[in-house]
Amino acid sequence: MCIRDSLSKVGIDTTYVGVSANCPSGVALINVDASGENSIAVASGANADLLPADIDAAEEAIASASLIIMQLETPVETVAHAARIARKHGVKVILNPAPAPREPLPASLLADVDIIIPNKTEAELISGVEITDSDSELRAINAIHAMGVPTVIFTLGSKGALICENGDCELIPSFKVAPVDTTAAGDTFCGALCVALSEDMPMRRAIEFANKAASITVTRMGAQQSIPTRDEVDF
């Protein structure tokens, strides 16, 4: 209940947040090193209980959305089902493939994705290409394009994000800050990007907006409490 309360306090609709009778909420244990980089151990908990039937119950909400964003912290078959529902209603589908998939993602899922936002590890696992330099980055991105995903936003940490679509790639540099904790940086980037795209910002501007939000997050300790407000990000 405390998780739902914390979401409600910041104006997030929790109508479709259910309660599992089988297990506790998912937990992530995060270790942060002296440079601010982190390593994360995850216990999925109730995340694993999200079923395609739960998506069906929320179909009306999905159909009325401008976009849907998903990760891989819930069962892949549920993610794929949500993508199909969104596609049926003409809703943009965005996938942040985190945690990095241990098994190949279903071709049917990737075919329903409009925008994918992987980091280096995730891009390697999805594409099957070892990334060692800029040339191998492009090979990995092209392999993902070939799987049916038209837009790839390859996040590069402190370097920024590489946006590739329609055969062209552009690096959108990050804002330079002194990081203390990179926890929630990727989630903040994805959330801010979705806000920007839902407001019809051009892609480059949307990524700049997301980069700024993430750059603020890494200057603070913690996860939810490190995420900036809209007033802090607007520029």
Each predicted region: which residue ranges?
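Conserved phosphate-binding/catalytic region of the ribokinase-like
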Residues: 102-103, 107, 111, 134-235
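Conserved N-terminal subdomain of the carbohydrate kinase-like
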Residues: 3-66, 84, 233-235
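Conserved beta-alpha-beta core of the PfkB/ribokinase-like small-molecule kinase fold
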Residues: 66-139, 158-161
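Anion (oxyanion) recognition and catalysis
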Residues: 8, 87, 145
